[in-house]
Amino acid sequence: MTSAPIAQQRLLIDLQDIDSRLARLRHERKHLPVLGRIESVIERLKTNKRAAIQADAALSEAKTRVTRSEDEVGQVVRRAEALRERLHSGNSAARDLSAIQGEIDQLGQRQSALEEAQIAAMEALDSAREESERLKQEESDIRVAGRELTAKRDAEFARLDQEIDSLEKQRADLAGTVETALLSDYEAVRASTGGLGAVALRGRTVEGGAVEISPQELARIVAAPQDQVIHAEENDVIIVRMDI
């Protein structure tokens, strides 16, 4: 059973206060609201990237369709011009003139259909370009928002890290004044409970943690020697008497 002067035991309450504050600060650092917002920005950027890949593919396909439609129209126009030259050259036999004119008429119909398809392809190209540009602008906006949030996160980290560093130094100084055996006892309890090592007992009231003591246990504590380090029956937390 560990024993230590009551003054030494009371240092554990100050140490616990620092440890509790450190735990709160570390929890705050890990769960800053800005971190969730940054994650949302990252997801938006991923979604934008996927959409941009699809948009670029659609733009490339639209360009190919426009080029193909232009080539098809050009071929029909050149063929029709060649036939008109034959028709008006006077070198064709009379029996061929009707066939030439018929093919010219068919090419005219074909040209009209191809030109309509060309217009549709150009409209699709314009839409694909607009979507690609929209996604590029969206990406830029997302990155701007990301940089702003990152700057805010870094500022919050710097503030919290400064507080944590200051408290860690205070803790090191204070821990250095606690007897080795008592400090080891405290640290072991903290490790087993997940952070709570010591609580203060003032009269019949336990302060600083969820520790309940029965009347029988209270009587045992009151009767214990002053330098005896007392552990709660419930969870082994060190109970420091503040009124003796």
Predicted regions and their residues:
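Non-transmembrane, heptad-repeat alpha-helical coiled-coil rod segments
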Residues: 125-160, 241-244
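Short, charged, amphipathic alpha-helical segments
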Residues: 39-46, 70, 97-105, 124-125, ...
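Amphipathic alpha-helical coiled-coil segments
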Residues: 54-66, 107-128, 174-175
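Extended, amphipathic alpha-helical coiled-coil scaffold segments used for oligomerization/tethering
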Residues: 49, 72-112
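Short cysteine-rich clusters marking metal-coordination/redox-active sites
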Residues: 206-209, 231-235
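Short, charge-rich amphipathic alpha-helices with coiled-coil/heptad character
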Residues: 1-5, 20-60, 86, 133-147
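Long amphipathic alpha-helical coiled-coil segments
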Residues: 68-80, 114-139, 184
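Coiled-coil termination/hinge junctions
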Residues: 146-208
